[in-house]
Amino acid sequence: MRVDYDVAAALRHEGLKPHDYDEICRRLQRAPNRVELGMFGVMWSEHCCYRNSRPLLSSFPTSGHRILVGPGENAGVVDLGDGQSLAFKIESHNHPSALEPFQGAATGVGGILRDIFTMGARPIALLNALRFGPLEDERNVGLMEGVVEGIAHYGNCVGVPTVGGEVAFDSSYSGNPLVNAMALGLMETDEIVCSGAHGVGYPVIYVGSTTGRDGMGGASFASAELTKASLDDRPAVQVGDPFLEKGLIEACLEAFKSGDVVAAQDMGAAGLTCSCSEMAAKGGLGIELDLDRVPARELGMTPYEFLLSESQERMLFVVKPGQEQSLMERFIRWGLQAAIVGCVLEEKVVRVLQKGEVVAEVPANALADDTPIDRHELVSDPPLEIQAKWDWQENLLPVVGLKGINLNSQSHFGSNISWDEILLKLLDDPTIASKRWVYRQYDHQVQANTVSAPGVSDAAVVRLRPQQGKGSVDEVKRGVAAVVDCPNRWVFLDPERGAMAAVAEAARNLSCVGAEPLAVTDNLNFPSPETPTGYWQLALACRGLSKACKTFSTPVTGGNVSLYNETRLADGKIQPIHPTPVVGMVGLVHNLVNVCGQAWLEPGDLIWLLGVPIDTTVAVDPRVSLAGSSYLECIHGLVTGRPPEIDLKLECLVQSFLRNSITEGFVRSAHDLSDGGLAVAVAECCIAANLGAHIELPSSDARLDRLLFAEGGSRILVSVPSTQAVAWQKVLNQAKTTAPGSVFDQYLGVVTADDELLITQAGNRLVQLPLNQLRECFEQAIPRRMGLDLSSSV
């Protein structure tokens, strides 16, 4: 069959390869027309079909006693007990946010919310994981301002609280920021709305906004590297309307309660093409779509434009015959467009009509189920660059003493730097510093169910208040905790260990608020898998995620893969991001009374370290290290070394012990040791509480910078009332008896009423800093780099 288009040019435009075209022709038994080729282009993109990553994802654990819905639907669903279920998922909007940060981030929020309420759940919380280049570059400042404003605008207007997240900075993200949005939704019914069409002849209803030319080919755009020419792809960035989405949420939840909706699918990536093909393929049926009935925003739209538009706030329903009119009236009352645009077919095809003519007809499974897989060879050894970094040893660092470090003359800090100065430098690192400038723009109290606000605890906590208005706030005892985590520097240096650490830290943060970890949603942000290094990073990270999720019994319920996150520089070189597998994890809080924050509560409380103890010998415990640490990068300008070993057994022991201790009322505050190690964690607790601390390090021949700033080791800082000292020691001894050979506690010091942080060793002062200096450094790091007024940042 001859075609009326330039095949080579069309393939380039759609991001398809010649062998893809040959396969399409084989499946259709003919050459595709230009509309059909566009449909294949978006549906066979990495963004939609995971053609490079699908074999790796199959290793993830996906089942468990609480899992109601796993991968394959719009969102995962877990059983919370007491007649409540939680829908949750994370998605990326990286490439759109790089070009139009406000709309890219805003529509990312809108899209993840639709995934949640399409399942029949009411959205109750949002989180986000963001990555930017250094704020010394004005372009990165502009990107960050736009992204944060977009997230705030959409979340605040739609009435869903943004309760947590993480923000990190690295030069690898300068041309390609990451914007990952996570949402949670509460369900109180057994009726989970799925997306598979059923009922031959059942009507298909279009609901929501009109269809325009915005977002054209967004799925293909999201599956390619960014270049200067990408600026021409601004039409691929969608435009959102949070007020319309608010009406869509209410109208859809009402419609679902009626029982008249048999299947639902939001129109996200690939728009009508994706929603029709996925609903048809999952149901084992077909769908006929009449474009003349689709509410259009612009005149003269072609079939290609209708099918590939990613206009926001749109849904597709399959409904029971005879109920379509009452449902459409309901939607119209909410100010939404509603139209019958097609029907369910027995024939397993997506058939598209315009002006009575068939403009496209493709087997549904060819678009949404039986899609191609690109297989890559996994190299057996790490890349040479990484092998060289693994050879690094701590003894290569400058000599340390009680007063600090003797640096070489080429250091930008001069020849010497004290421990006080080092701690302040770390607190001034934007990745470690307070994110108050970010989260104060988010409404985290809307819906009045937020228990732990951003910056207060290691994980967000939201009250599980009944949606039907039964019971007062005070009567609600249970909550759900959520967190997003990824140590991207560790993943860059060792993808398997780094990914394991991401899961471990997410679970540890949930445990720090007293929550039982339940399940995971993941967002795999990686560069191109078509290079040996890129695929090695992706494959080993998936291996690490799988191993850790199995150990923690936290199944993966779904997520997102975002590849080709890299920038082609002016000189033609490729700048890949650090591989960033973001782990979103949810947990159940059985009693909100016991929720812990980071802040000390009372002077005199005892400070204990759980996890691998501080070294008392020169021998280096491989579970705690300066390799890959914030200290190494911030102070010495090095991103090197092999990150610490991840002791998953110890993680489980420590976290279980912590949760039990919180439940029993022993632990008053809890904060995990992460970026910056012990000294930074103690400083953060002091800043949060406005109380001081005196930490006495044990006598040791180990390097002092290792004692103060090393990372890893499943470590958590807790405070215990002094009145409970004897009982607490009994609990610790009992835990050691239960798990012989695992020493995982160490007394460090005491909370003080003094306005300073004091760290000593054998009576020698190492760190002595007033709280106001710590706080000023911590709170002003980001606003100062952005050139903002500092008077309101503390």
UniProtKB/Swiss-Prot annotation:
Its name, as the record gives it, is Phosphoribosylformylglycinamidine synthase subunit PurL
Would you say which domain of life the source belongs to? Bacteria
Q: What high-level taxonomic lineage is stated for the organism?
A: Bacteria, Bacillati, Cyanobacteriota, Cyanophyceae, Synechococcales
Q: Which amino acids does the record list as binding Mg(2+) 1?
A: E91, N560
Q: What class of enzyme is it?
A: ligase
Name its cellular compartments: Cytoplasm
- Its source organism is Prochlorococcus marinus (strain MIT 9313)
The residues that hold Mg(2+) 2 are: D115, D266
Instruction: Tell me the keywords, alphabetical order.
Output: ATP-binding, Cytoplasm, Ligase, Magnesium, Metal-binding, Nucleotide-binding, Purine biosynthesis
List the EC numbers from the record: 6.3.5.3
**How does this chain assemble?**
Monomer. Part of the FGAM synthase complex composed of 1 PurL, 1 PurQ and 2 PurS subunits.
Q: List the pathway annotation.
A: Purine metabolism; IMP biosynthesis via de novo pathway; 5-amino-1-(5-phospho-D-ribosyl)imidazole from N(2)-formyl-N(1)-(5-phospho-D-ribosyl)glycinamide: step 1/2
